[in-house]
Amino acid sequence: MRRRRSALLAGSFALLAVVGGIAWQTKLRRPEGRLTGVGPRMVSNQTSQPVSLYGENLRRGMKLRLSEPFDRAVPMTVVDARHAYARLPSDLTLPVGTAQVTAALSIDGQRTRSEVGLTVVNDGAFADYTLLVRSGDVLWAASTTTDALVRLDPSTGEVSHLPGGDGPSALAAWTEADGQPRLAVAHTWTPELWILDGRTGAVLRTLRAPVYATGVAVDPHRRLVVLAETVENTVRALSLDDGRELWRRDVLPDPRPLALAGDTVVVGSQGSGELETLGLDDGRTAESLGPRPGTPIVGGHTEPHARDVMGGKAPRSLLWSSSLGKLFVTSIGPNIGPNPQRMEVSMNGGVGVVDLAARRFERHLGFGAGVTEGMALDEGSKRLYVADVALGLVRALDAAALVSGDDGARKAELWRLPVLPPPDFPLAREAADYGVNGRAGAELHSGPRALALSASGAQLYVLDRFTATVAVVEDARSSQPRLERQIPLETSIGPRERRLGQVLYYADMGRSGMSCDSCHLEGHDEGILFEKTHPLRIYRSPTVRGTRETPPYFTPASTGSLAETSRVVGDRNRYMNPTLTESEVRQLTLFSATVTNLPNPYRGPDGAPPVSIALPGGGIGRPLEGRRLFDSKADCVRCHPPPLFTTDQDLSTRGHFIDVGTPRAFPLRTGDQETVFRGVGVPSLVGAWDVFPMLTTGLAGFREENGRAVPADRVPLRAMIERYSAPPHGNAAALDAQEKADLLAYLLTL
């Protein structure tokens, strides 16, 4: 019996050895998983980021490995042997002095060397203060990139940093019926609206709110809080007390600033340049407003071209005067379209006046230079203060004169005050080069972005974006205001080269009205322009986000790198007054190269597309089914291959301009456009969910109507599929309705 048991045991061990050997040999023969690409190739570390992974022999259970300086393993969601997704964590921390790093990506445990790199931009340590409000006796400022919410007591200069949530993106202050000051904080990535004690910053309650919030306004009497967001492009009203959604309305693309105006709220569309009014009680909308052909332009080089106006440009700030019954809007001015003189510099920054009751954009006061943004109004003295981020100036205007008529508006400026940067702030070039030959002064390094008034109106507070300071202007109501002091919000400006590149991106050194930001607001798209290139015609103004990987630039191609673009366009913007130095080219190139795509909001918590998504404009789409169609029946992948979905991603296929049968010119005064056609470039589809308009002409988004450009498509991706996707531009026209919905769903997740 013992011998039999021993024999059985021996046989069992032998069998196990054989099975184990077979398994071991099978494992050895199993091909090693490896990565071949990642999209996007550059991300920000300011929040968690979804990425698409491409490779060979990918299997479930694999992890993504990030090399030094992170040395992290991240879970992967593997779809098939060639496709996977991951979500990078939000704590990829880098030293304050580091602008960016490139880490190697590989499969965790991969033995062969990986050639796939991912650049991580250090936005999480690059403070960028753009928001300022007064609540009671204290000021509140916020930096979206660094998640900073800052309390500032201007009487003492005391600065306190509080957690701001994931990407604080909009602030609103008000006073409750019992006299208590309150502060609302909306967010880009935290799906919450915070209600804070306006004195201390203590969180009183948290309301569920949409992500990608871009504007917030509070009506304490109606107990309403109104938010704008840019994923679904809606404005929503929530109960201030319990957060219930009271109404929701679709609005024009990329809604940004909000202003309460009596029983309505006004929202400005960055994509279309239009204004919309919504009733506070029910969200009812009226026809949009904006500059129209013939809208008076008072001052600046575009004044003779009022008849050539084809629409508006992005409203940068809105402010309602209850005493004057007018709305003020800052922008780079009415959008000048094709004209017999071929004048193609539409930028004329200033302030517009809108009569909401008459539904009329009354006039635009142009300053002829700079980019006007933030505003503050002293209702008592009827003084309107405006900040110029491109020139480093603050102006005071007689608001009553501004609304009185064109003649009054021409004389409305009361004073202008340069806001010089602190003495230890670096300059982009020699100090002697500023303020001569008609150039802007060294004050352009400060970047006045937002304004707030003291309760008495005697002090004006200026949030300077580039220096991260709040400047205190005394005697604001007098004819001789003075810059009393500057209060720093941060101890470091971050990487010197990148910060100076930011200054150069926004600056109007040559006082031409042109800057990188005037065409590409905050590094993104901004409607259409009758533009400074040849052939001279109407083009869409494309995004800068993620473009470092996809030269050449312009249509037809005129610059082959970001550095060449910085040189050529930078010099042109200044009218060569002066030409950029080599260091300025380097700094501007660095900043432009660190403008990243936003995290895709259509991805799930694991970074992968969900099984299905609700589509903007209606319907349900299945992204993974859409990918299969993209790669086959719809024939999109031929010109838009992954990982960046453009043939410009690789040197061997870069710069091939083609004719795919899409419209060649925008049909507005074509006799004043150069309609010669040399082909179109292939845009990247990464981040396409947030692009408006599409096509080189902008005709997936706008149409011509009565001599102007009218926003026509709220979802340009849908317009592309339904109107512009017959051969030779792919073959989505052959898809049935559900297949088109699936393809749209996939494109939204790129």
Residue map of PLM features:
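Short loop/turn segments that connect beta-strands within beta-propeller blades
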Residues: 153-157, 197-201, 239-243, 279-283, ...
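Surface loop/turn motifs at the tips and blade-to-blade linkers of beta-strand repeat domains
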Residues: 121-125, 162-166, 206-210, 248-252, ...
